[in-house]
């Protein structure tokens, strides 16, 4: 992806200097943990221990050794200093601190640090708020979807949770519904216009006051004609509303719900794989490693009581099993991190696409509502033009002229009566 996807990376501890006074057995090297405590790693067998190994194979330099065959990672790096994962996908073990951390910590230098640095919520890794620095937003100052919907939210309708991505999908579908309802609203507006035009046309044919005469009669006739003209204007307005506003609103993204459903399934499948498959495998492997380490520790303690070839053989066998359990855990964690990285990248890509779609939807509706107001202004202008002839004729109404015309047509005589003579 072009966008730099900043995920919390881990910094390796500086390796400790090997002892200047004591020569370690072949393959063993010493390092310092992040807390400053020295531990030892066999680079051949990936064996890790807090106690300085002796030159005798299988026996530590001091009683009560607590060794771990887990190829330990400290802050996302192997003890040898090489990254446990590529820097862009490095993550810590996904667990909250538990009461058993003391046992595991004594066997694995970096395990306790891992628990303090991260926290697991619904199978997703997050930096621990008490120990990790604040992350830089992917798109600062933009309030982008890709920055604010990583966690789950309590479902107000029930006792469960709703994924952040699900909230974004709900907004998209709600936007589609709002768009549909706006289209229905315009449809109702069109019906009103059509009914209004029909009534205007019908009224224009009414014969009331049809016998009005003179200039006033002409003005009255124009009033009735203007109703027919206005009816035509409103019919054209309703037709344009249908073709230029209602229809585009209704047909915009006809397959949107189907597309959103596919999108939902894609992200949900990735999240399901992360939780039900990868995280479950990590927890299973972690439990198995704990059991193997306990078994190894128990056999090591037995060695303190009774030294025998059989006990040493049991320790070697337990160490091999512990090593295998450690390898299995690292493999499961690596697969988990890969799955989480895939989910992370798809979340960023998809949320940015949803963001783009929302901007596009809002802009589309805005443009068509602007078209509505433009058509409305045009309708007002046309309506004004229908009454202009009426205004002109009304200005020409002349009661005196009308009287003259009427008298000329209907006069009965201009000889006035006179007094009767005797």
UniProtKB/Swiss-Prot annotation:
Q: Where is the composition biased (Polar residues)?
A: 41-52, 95-117
InterPro entries the UniProt entry points to:
AH/BAR_dom_sf (IPR027267), F_BAR (IPR031160), FCH_dom (IPR001060), GAS7_F-BAR (IPR037957), WW_dom (IPR001202), WW_dom_sf (IPR036020)
UniProt-recorded name of the protein: Growth arrest-specific protein 7
Instruction: Tell me, in a sentence or two, what this protein's role is.
Output: May play a role in promoting maturation and morphological differentiation of cerebellar neurons.
Keywords (A to Z) from UniProt: Coiled coil, Cytoplasm, Developmental protein, Differentiation, Neurogenesis, Phosphoprotein
Query: Region entry Disordered: which residue ranges?
Result: 1-117
- Look up keyword RNA-binding and say if it applies: no
Which residues, renumbered to this chain, carry the PTM Phosphoserine?
Answer: 62, 108
Please tell me the species this chain comes from: Rattus norvegicus
Query: Where in the numbering of this chain does the WW domain appear?
Result: 22-55
- One GO biological process from the UniProt record? regulation of cell shape
């Amino acid at each position: 992806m072009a966008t730099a996807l900043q995920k919390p990376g881990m910094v390796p501890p500086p390796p400790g200097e090997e002892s200047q006074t004591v020569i370690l057995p072949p393959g063993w090297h010493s390092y310092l943990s992040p807390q400053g405590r020295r531990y030892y790693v066999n680079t051949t067998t990936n064996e890790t221990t807090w106690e300085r190994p002796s030159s005798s194979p299988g026996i530590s330099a001091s009683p009560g050794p607590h060794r771990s065959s887990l190829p330990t990672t400290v802050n996302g790096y192997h003890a040898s200093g090489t990254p446990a994962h590529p820097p862009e996908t490095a993550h810590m073990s996904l667990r909250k601190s538990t009461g058993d951390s003391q046992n595991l910590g004594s066997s694995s230098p970096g395990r306790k640090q891992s628990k303090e640095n991260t926290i697991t919520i619904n199978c997703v890794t997050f930096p621990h708020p008490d120990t990790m620095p604040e992350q830089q937003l992917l798109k600062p100052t933009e309030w982008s979807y890709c920055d604010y919907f990583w966690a789950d939210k309590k479902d107000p309708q029930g006792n469960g949770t709703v994924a952040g991505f699900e909230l974004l999908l709900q907004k998209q579908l709600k936007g589609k519904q709002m768009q549909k309802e706006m289209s229905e609203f315009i449809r109702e507006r069109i019906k009103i216009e059509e009914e209004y035009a029909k009534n205007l046309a019908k009224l224009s044919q009414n014969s009331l006051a049809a016998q009005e005469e003179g200039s006033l009669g002409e003005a009255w006739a124009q009033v009735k004609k203007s109703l027919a003209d206005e009816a035509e204007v409103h019919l054209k307005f309703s037709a344009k509303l249908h073709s230029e506003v209602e229809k585009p609103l209704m047909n915009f993204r006809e397959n949107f719900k189907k597309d959103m459903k596919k999108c939902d399934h894609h992200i949900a499948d990735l999240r399901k794989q992360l939780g039900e498959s990868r995280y479950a495998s990590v927890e299973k492997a972690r439990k198995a490693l704990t059991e193997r380490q306990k078994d190894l520790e128990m056999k090591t303690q037995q060695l303190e009581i009774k030294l025998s070839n059989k006990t040493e053989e049991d320790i070697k066998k337990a160490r091999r099993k512990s090593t295998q359990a450690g390898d299995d855990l690292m493999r499961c964690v690596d697969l988990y991190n890969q799955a989480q990285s895939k989910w992370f990248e798809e979340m960023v890509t998809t949320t940015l696409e949803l963001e783009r779609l929302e901007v596009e939807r809002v802009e589309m509706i805005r443009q068509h509502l602007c078209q509505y107001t433009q058509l409305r202004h045009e309708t007002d202008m046309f309506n004004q033009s229908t009454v202009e002839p009426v205004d002109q004729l009304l200005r020409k109404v002349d009661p005196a002229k009308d009287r003259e015309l009427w008298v000329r047509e209907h006069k009965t005589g201009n000889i006035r009566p006179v007094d009767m003579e005797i």
